[in-house]
Amino acid sequence: MARYLGADCKLCRREKMKLFLKGSKCESPKCPIEERPYPPGEHGRTRAKESEYLLQLREKQKCARIYGVLEKQFRRYYEEASRKTGRTGENLLRILESRLDNVVYRAGFAASRDQARQLVRHGHFLVNGRRVDIPSYRVSENDVIEVAEKSRELTPFVIARAVAGERTVPPWLEVIPNRLRILVHSLPSRQVIDTPVQEQLIVEFYSK
């Protein structure tokens, strides 16, 4: 599956905010946006006032970058969200949150969504007892996700056990650190999704 291969820190500077794409580096003084809080490029410091369309485009791109999803798949998610009952923007965020790589990240088993994607691809997770190596796999209510027995002593999971409790886990998930297990109690409502996006701008972008 295609994925973005450029510099993650440039994406944060382009959006003028931390997207937390680099794990612990984003929390440190070494984060480039701390030293250069303006978009990359020769004219990054003097960016012109953005049009309504550009604001909508940037919000769509920001959301896709946060979750590590490229345009073709992101649009498919939007189209699926628009067919569901309820608010399209909230449906879209719920779909993105239900991706297996995001759940692994939210549970604290990976430092970033990118690392979570790699761990899933390498076959380190079971969902309801069956190995799943597709990062975009969508979890459902009452699913049980756990680290495969053969993978439990790998460094990311040793760290996950050691720092359990230091990271806030969203209320729709439950983590059992000593068993490296994640319980999906429900899919999230908008109120508990802390992704810093204005989803209505994304809806307006695709509605044109």
From Swiss-Prot:
PROSITE patterns: RIBOSOMAL_S4, S4
UniProt xrefs under Gene3D superfamilies: Ribosomal Protein S4 Delta 41, Chain A, domain 1, RNA-binding S4 domain
Entry keyword set: Ribonucleoprotein, Ribosomal protein, RNA-binding, rRNA-binding
Superkingdom: Bacteria
InterPro entries, sorted: Ribosomal_uS4 (IPR022801), Ribosomal_uS4_bac-type (IPR005709), Ribosomal_uS4_CS (IPR018079), Ribosomal_uS4_N (IPR001912), S4_RNA-bd (IPR002942), S4_RNA-bd_sf (IPR036986)
GO CC annotation terms, alphabetical: small ribosomal subunit
GO BP terms in the entry: ribosomal small subunit biogenesis; translation
Segments forming domain S4 RNA-binding: 98-163
SUPFAM superfamilies registered for this protein in UniProt: Alpha-L RNA-binding motif
Molecular function GO labels: rRNA binding; structural constituent of ribosome
Record flagged with keyword Plastid: no
Subunit structure of this chain's protein: Part of the 30S ribosomal subunit. Contacts protein S5. The interaction surface between S4 and S5 is involved in control of translational fidelity.
Family assignment from sequence similarity: Belongs to the universal ribosomal protein uS4 family.
Function, as annotated: One of the primary rRNA binding proteins, it binds directly to 16S rRNA where it nucleates assembly of the body of the 30S subunit.
Matching NCBIfam families: PRK05327.1, rpsD_bact
PANTHER family: 30S 40S RIBOSOMAL PROTEIN (PTHR11831), SMALL RIBOSOMAL SUBUNIT PROTEIN US4M (PTHR11831:SF4)
Protein name from the UniProt record: Small ribosomal subunit protein uS4
